[in-house]
UniProtKB/Swiss-Prot annotation:
Any Gene Ontology CC annotation: cytosol
Name of the gene: ligA
Alphabetized GO MF terms: DNA binding; DNA ligase (NAD+) activity; metal ion binding
EC class (word): ligase
Binding site for NAD(+): 33-37, 82-83, 115, 138, 175, 293, 317
Keyword field contains DNA repair: yes
Amino-acid positions noted as binding Zn(2+) in the UniProt annotation, renumbered to this chain: 411, 414, 429, 435
UniProt keywords, alphabetically: DNA damage, DNA repair, DNA replication, Ligase, Magnesium, Manganese, Metal-binding, NAD, Zinc
Signal peptide (UniProt feature, chain positions): none
Protein's job: DNA ligase that catalyzes the formation of phosphodiester linkages between 5'-phosphoryl and 3'-hydroxyl groups in double-stranded DNA using NAD as a coenzyme and as the energy source for the reaction. It is essential for DNA replication and repair of damaged DNA.
Protein name (Swiss-Prot/TrEMBL): DNA ligase
Record-listed E.C. numbers: 6.5.1.2
Family annotation (SMART domains): BRCT (SM00292), HhH1 (SM00278), LIGANc (SM00532)
Amino acid sequence: MPHSIETQLEHLREKLREYEYHYHVLDNPLVPDAEYDRLMNELKNLEWQHPELITSDSPTQRVGAKPLDGFAQITHEIPMLSLDNAFSDDDLTGFLRRIEDRIAINSNQIEFCCEPKLDGLAVSILYVDGVLTQAATRGDGTTGEDITANIRTIRNIPLKLKTNNPPHRLEVRGEVFMPQQGFEQLNEKALAKGEKTFANPRNAAAGSLRQLDPKITSQRPLMLNAYNIGVYESDDELPTTHFDRLQWLKTLGIPVNAEITLATGSQALTAFYQKIQAKRSSLGYDIDGTVLKVNEITLQEQLGFISKAPRWAIAYKFPAQEEMTILNDVEFQVGRTGAITPVAKLEPVFVAGVTVSNATLHNGDEIERLGIAIGDTVIIRRAGDVIPQIVGVVAERRPDNAKKIAFPTACPVCNSAVVRVEGEAVARCTGGLFCGAQRKEALKHFVSRKAMDIDGVGEKLIEQLMERELIHTPADLFKLDHTTLMRLDRMGEKSANNALQSIEKAKNTTLARFLFALGIRDVGESTAQNLANHFGTLDAIRQADLDTLKQVQDVGEVVANRLFQFWQEPHNVEVVEDLIAQGVTWQDVVPQEIADNPLKDKTVVLTGTLTQLTRDQAKALLQQLGCKVSGSVSSKTDYLIAGEKAGSKLAKAQELGVKILSEDELIGYFTTIVS
């Protein structure tokens, strides 16, 4: 085969890549569209004549994959975390103060990389030796869906990096979105064909990325803006600032947002926020705020992460959009713990890209605060552009036939008494698991991903099983068989087998998951894990008295009482024993041994300003020493750790004769024990 054909093919590919880079990344087209199309057709014809020379990174190969049966799962090597939100100047000030507290640098001296917060879908794109190899959705942050074939169809994403010296592995993280003009054109075409339209550009982008047929995705006007780097393997070091890393990505052909800038000091951050907010309607794509990131990578590393978000970044969201509508009715829903929640039934209204017909009224106090009545004209807001809320009533529009909202005194589901404990805002049904609504929600919680993770059993299946009275308690799930499931509506052979396999798989769990799945009020994931780590076995937890329970990290008086009372209820014990009898099992946790030290098993209070540790670090250190950390000084307090400017707690401790330790003494204890 003539060598000139290979050379000609590569020349055409490089030229087309260059044109794509200038068009999609630099927004500076080098040639008319007709010339681009001519070269693309020339390349297609040559590759058709010489199929053995087609490469996976050729511009012609954006759409070539066959339709998929479903999306495979991909585990992110580095979790794709979400961001904490700020909704006001006070929230921004709090964010900056937390940074100052952690790294002891005045926030007005810290440079931030400021970006618009695009309203799209977060994705991860992996390049291996410069070639696009894999792409995934964010998913739950740990696991996403394989959307490689669809990502390859997006025109402003290079299939091959624009460099002769690519990193061995480079993971680009960014937001896929649909520009407003493309969204409008897509809906116009759908209307012309009599097809369903999309509510907003974000939904359109999500639906396009999750098409099983990449050819459909290729017809959708999607774009990417990169915002970070994940996995990176190369002999070359990355730039030392976030901004410079984004500019480096741009040189590789990866598109980044044109509005990104640097700012130092709270006034400059607020000015950027206001500038982007003013430009919001003219940008041509949807945004819902700004993202502010500490620019220096070394400072990012010092600040670190909390469980679900980095400490060095925040999403400063725009005020939610508001609209007026009519309150037609109020329904009262019963939750898993018996909480009675009033739900407003609204005349449908379009707010922030979504049609809203329901909104929570939270509780009876909120109804009184708003002074709301059925028939009122209300102001609806999507808080954070996500959760619909009623924020006010237009009193002058109240009709003569407006009807006062009566909070129920009996459960709307089981007719049990509704009570409100003094000091709590929520009224609750007293029916417990006698109440069908509580039982249903408890079962939904039991099978949920963070509990027993029975992914073949969804909410609709739970509802159908309960309606037919085939299950009453969690243990009944493990008694289901193939014949029973096949009698259900819309239950096929495959679905029945998947459900039974998921149920069987769920029998092997962990003590923490099992505790969380039981749905004990106020026992969340973290508390369940702390209980498992502290006690090691279920029997030890069941036998613990109130004082023993309160020794567990983050378990106070209220949670200890909830736990203790749970095990005093014979029905709860029966449910747990039935689950174990059905084969639910886990490995006992070996409790961590804490070396003997003067602070072990003591109650300690922190006060004042610490200079070497943050408050969270000091608390964690005390817990490693086996202390119970309390928030207030009492006669039961053994030690007070006093930092600078200690106030009333120090005075009270001295009055009660509590031993006072300095921050240095605390660190000294810890250093002695671990060394």
